[in-house]
Amino acid sequence: MIAIPDKPYMTLQEYFEWEVQQGCKYEYVNGEVYAMTGGTIPHSAIAVNLSAALRPHVRSRSCRVLSSDAKVAISETGPSFYPDLSITCDSRDRGAIDAICHPCLIVEVLSPSTESYDRGAKFAHYRRLESLREYVLISSDRVNVEIFRLNERHKWELTPYAAGETVQFTSIEFECPIELLYEDVDLSPQDSAQDSPQESSDARTSSQQ
C-alpha cells in the first residue's frame, strides 16, 4: 500500500464517497487512505482458481464468494480492506453496497511487498471481526498455503499445507487438492521446491493469540 500525502482525515463514510471518484482502489486505516498496488499474474491466477473452485460449493450454502473488488469493513468506523477473496454466509451482508462486515473466511495471496503486513498488522485488524473463523495466506512463488483457524478456546491456530496435500476450509466444509490453486500458475523451479507432506504435517503446532 502507498500512503497518500497531505490527505485530510476522513471518516469511513467520507472514504466510501471519496473512493468512488478515484481511478484506483484505496484501503482505509485510522482515517487515512492508502493506494492499492497491482498484483502479479500468478497472484491473480491463484485468486481466480480458488474463487472458481469455491463458487459451486458455497452457492448451496447461501454463502457468497467475493473478489478483491469487495471491501471488508472491520467496524462502523473502519478500517476497511480489500482482501483477495472473502466469503460471507451472514444475512446481514446481503444488502451491503460499500463493504461487507461479517465474513467467515478471508484470503490473502502473498506478495513480497505486502507479506509482512498481511501476516502482522492486517491480520490483527481482521481478528477483530467476530464472524471470522479462518484467515488464509497463499504463497504466490511456491506451493504453500497457511490457514489460521479460530479454535474453541478462541485462539488462532496455524495449519500449513504443502504440495500433495488437501487444503481444508472447515468454516464452510470445503476441501480441494492444493495443486488446484496453482493450476496454470508458472512457478520458477528454485522457488517451487517444497517440504514433504510429512514435514508439513509435523509442523502443525504453531498458534497465534
Show the residue positions of the predicted features.
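Gly/Pro/Ser/Thr-rich low-complexity, intrinsically disordered segments predominantly at protein N-termini
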Residues: 1-209
